[in-house]
Amino acid sequence: MKSSCEKAIFAMWLLFAAAVVSPAQTFTNLLDFNFTDGAAPASTLIQATDGNLYGYTTEGGLDVCAGSCGTLFKIDDQGKLTTFYEFCKQGKLPCLDGMIPNGALIQASDGNFYGTTMQGGPNNGPNCPHGCGTIFRITPKGKLTTLYNFCSRANCADGASPEGALLQASNGKLYGETGIGGNGVQFGMGTLFELTLQGKLTTIHTFCANYPDCSDGIGPTFGLIQGRNGNLYGTAAEGGGVVNDRTLLYGTVFELKLDGTLTSIYSFCLSGYPSCPDGAYPVGQLVQATDGTFYGATNQGGTGPFGTIFKMTSSGQLTTIHAFQGTDGGFPSGIMQASNDAFYGSTDYEGANGEGGTLFLLNSVGFTTLYNFCSQSNCTDGSSPSVLTQGTDGVFYGTTSTGGNLNACFGGCGTLFSLTDGLHAFVEASPNFGKAGRKVILLGTNLAGTSSVSFHGTPATFHIVSKSEVITTVPAGATSGKIKVTTPRGTLTSNVKFRVTH
């Protein structure tokens, strides 16, 4: 636990972070996509209970969608890529199973994967002539079931074009967003929805329903998170006030109770574009860090004006902690908090090479550019990286939507890469909170010989499922803190503190 002095120092470096010279990291291009196995990967990768990485491509696969069918893929610990689903299985338009997957996959409590497609499905709308999108479930073996087709209601009142990753909340239900649709103005400004694992969808909020008052936001696109208080938090790409002529304003941060009550807690750039010192157009999922504060990014604005990284209290007090200047990257994609409590992120463009984007670190030393894409001729190392994910081996993984193999796609079909920064292997608890008696899945590496599990020093019973998965139970008397797992190769510690509830 940090002392009050340490907390003060932590706050100070966030406020005054400055660019510093990067120490040596190891960047490795693991593979180039070749269109047949997919193209334009755009999702944050996830690590599943089998230890493999999973993601999607927005293009490639079956050649029936003018290049935009999309695929789902997995990568094993040897770096082998397997395409385990290609969209538009029927081989012709319309793609009833969906097309252009969007938002990261999630693995739900039933072990299956869930995700969305922006287009496809049987229902067309004013802004989605090739289908208004789907929600799907797919088994680890690749059997896909469509759970919901959007625009199933008159005037797309249920939403259209879902965007961002789904979230499985503590009540077991899935929550997500659509970028358009709903009963608002001009074909709808987007919705928030709740979905059971059986496919029953309930629209719980419609954005800008009281046009021209769009203070709740317009176009949620990057997925929700569940805060420590049980409420959901997210961002809308635009909106935040009263729409004036064509001015859509510059985005919001909102809080959503599970009963559907939405509160806008921050509106960006109320001073008016381009003077947006607090940023404009929020991107990526919010992160509620180990200190309870929310962190996020905006795609534009700041003093650069190439976007910002910010922190914000639950009451809406926002502080800009870094403003991109172009040479350090521009137009960030989002951030994540790693096992060392530091923040890692990516930018879509700019950087030292003038294009391609960057990977960066924000820690107690300050802001550090870790890698500049397009460092190789013709951007064969990739360009426009996704938000990073950290594997339980301590290594960061990500994709780039362009660059790489120039022979298969104009400008490259995209890449998959890794970045090491000297971080150790760890275990990840899912969920990372719960009361005594709750089952918890521990993900890690080399867990087959696990000999003990403890919650902040309290021994727990456990069952070894595989080399990458152990199931344990929160023991009676446990207190909040790190989980430790003893294996033949040493002791692994959880990446975040497990929060014991009562």
Describe these PLM feature segments.
Residues K2-H502:
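Extracellular beta-propeller repeat domains
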